[in-house]
Amino acid sequence: MWTPRAPPPRPALLFLLLLLLRVTHGLFPDEPPPLSVAPRDYLSHYPVFVGSGPGRLTPAEGAEDLNIQRVLRVNRTLFIGDRDNLYQVELEPSTSTELRYQRKLTWRSNPSDIDVCRMKGKQEGECRNFVKVLLLRDESTLFVCGSNAFNPICANYSMDTLQLLGDNISGMARCPYDPKHANVALFSDGMLFTATVTDFLAIDAVIYRSLGDRPTLRTVKHDSKWFKEPYFVHAVEWGSHVYFFFREIAMEFNYLEKVVVSRVARVCKNDVGGSPRVLEKQWTSFLKARLNCSVPGDSHFYFNVLQAVTGVVSLGGRPVILAVFSTPSNSIPGSAVCAFDMNQVAAVFEGRFREQKSPESIWTPVPEDQVPRPRPGCCAAPGMQYNASNALPDEILNFVKTHPLMDEAVPSLGHSPWIVRTLIRHQLTRVAVDVGAGPWGNQTIVFLGSEVGTVLKFLVKPNASVSGTTGPSIFLEEFETYRPDRCGRSSSAGEWGQRLLSLELDAASGGLLAAFPRCVVRVPVARCQLYSGCMKNCIGSQDPYCGWAPDGSCIFLRPGTSATFEQDVSGASTSGLGDCTGLLRASLSDDRAGLVSVNLLVTSSVAAFVVGAVVSGFSVGWFVGLRERRELARRKDKEAILAHGGSEAVLSVSRLGERRGTGTGGRGGAGGGPGGPPEALLAPLMQNGWTKAALLHGGPHDLDSGLLPTPEQTPLPQKRLPTTHPHAHALGPRAWDHSHALLSASASTSLLLLAHTRAPEQPPVPTESGPESRLCAPRSCRASHPGDFPLTPHASPDRRRVVSAPTGPLDSSSVGDDLPGPWSPPATSSLRRPGPHGPPTAALRRTHTFNSGEARPGGHRPRRHAPADSTHLLPCGTGERTAPPVP
């Protein structure tokens, strides 16, 4: 019998949850909240550019929304590259909340280029001229490239007047075709270095050098060892090389499917290409290495997706770049900031190479004795063994062509990230750094921008004496930069309109320039006025831009200020400064714009999994138990039906019929006890082919017990013995087999219409049949004339019907001859007719199951021979066949 399983003890489940919580807490240490959060109402005070011109407070009526692509700051002037337009905006301090352009250049695609673009299947909004390259070529010239309806074009413009200088030139390999594609570009020594795609389908990625006095060079075309779906992020010039930062699919991890890694590649400025045989008009100095930004441990946790890179800055006397990395979109959300020393970057390019000997093999380091000399990737120059790169031996050029990847990765300073943030909603994608913050210019502030314009401000303290490690970074402030009232609401602009394009520091004005597709917002780097009136809040903010003045105000401190102030960026105790009503940290840190720690995310996921597993276990157990309970109840019902009638194990049909006639229903009385009426008890016993409705809907005494199966009616099968005796009355015990043969022969030539009529019930009358005595069947089951026999129910194909064979003499008094027979056998019938005074040849003997009923009243007269009921031997159909009586 099924018994429900006991639920697991609750203390064990709680202990498991607490253990998992502690493990996740150890894996993802909780991150401190910001010391302050700027109120959102301060956004309305930030100046914003939305395309307004001189003398206009708002853009002209009917003007399109901006679609900004590039922003370039040159001294106190900001150039904004838009769709079909180029704006010049002055950044002089102003009390106005509106930034207006002083000059505007309209640069649209010509109709023929638009028509060709539309013919290529592009949308009308894509067939425009999007400014994708915006550079300062010299002190007075701007170099601008636009997508020009998927036919890139470049031109030079005067920086002061925005007038065209010279003719337009092709933008192929200088500017992407699609405005959604990433690209980088810079000028170095009068030469343009670009990283983009060179075709309409964006398949051929390239690092390209053009303009200047040196030949144009490019990377090897369609070689996955050089590039595999790169996404270019930034480019910097340092020493005799130009460094390109990008991310791509790593070919060295091709056995792990698509793994994105961050790279840095470099080329020599003075490279002139290879020989006519190898690498002609292609880079001979191109090498690339992996950038390693990971959390150390037994198994490093990598931040592989490069998002943004700063220029080369000096930190502690070292040339350093800061880069923002994030996790892949299908991983735990998180971002990190790592710093890289350019000297270490250069050292990696002097290390070992990595190679793949066959397409199926893994990548392995190249032994040093197999590296040719001079070293591949070096910058050939006058005074060296080879004066130019095109003079290098083919062995070196071939090695460079097939071995562009370095074996070692570039380590980050301190071998760990300087800043790690785990965000649930938006990753960090932009970075700006101020290495001269504070009144003495000796503090480093890092601004990190998220995808939707939220900026996080950190104070970092590099320690140059200990391998470039940094102490714990201090999360100073969190503030918003996107103005929905001017740049568009999130519902209308969507994620695209709120995407942060660039974040640039304007140290002269003490602000940040945050560019979005529809606007540019200038945000102050600090909000010191929030702490005015409370010395503890001002000093406790640890903000290098803020100081406490003697007049009781918190003021903004510019580099080199001569004002008197108090400041403590080391985070010393402020307990002696008294308390302030409404401490800012407590009042403003509650709302963190949806930034959720990974601790909560992982803990919730684990808890949901455990609870779901427990609930699922209980549910499965309950359903299994329910099925067992139903099966047990079904067995009990069957036993109750079979055991109906008290202590008797089985009720025969005749006994049940007698109880019906007498009105006793067993334990419960006449159909009123627990057993219910006999019809209800007998209905479940009916098998396929028996009409239960006819049984249950009959009259109170219409139950024919002869129609129901009983154990007496289904004896074991009897073996039939062959016989050839022509006289049935002399066969004795073998008459059954002989009658079966006769019935089979008759059934093939005759069709008998069965007629079954019911007669009123009469009391049973004893009758004599030779030496035996029995009770005749009721009228409903007796033959009214020699051709009528009891009707038997239609048999199911699965039902086995066996009746007892006749063994005694035939009772001639049981059949009347007053009615004519409906069927006469042929004269050749093998059944003999009895003489006027002869006895019957056989007696129809019924089992006691057929004796429940009443006999037909009247005298007993000699009758013709009647065969036994052998209908079970005939085939089933719409009507059953019965052996005819002997005339």
Curated annotation (Swiss-Prot):
Residues 662-674 have a biased composition (Gly residues). Residues 1-26 form the signal peptide. Disulfide bonds join 117-127, 145-154, 268-379, 293-338, 487-519, 528-546, 534-580, 538-554. The keyword Transmembrane helix applies. Residues 627-887 are cytoplasmic. One of its GO terms (cellular component) is plasma membrane. This is Semaphorin-6B. It comes from Rattus norvegicus. The lineage of its organism: Eukaryota, Metazoa, Chordata, Craniata, Vertebrata.
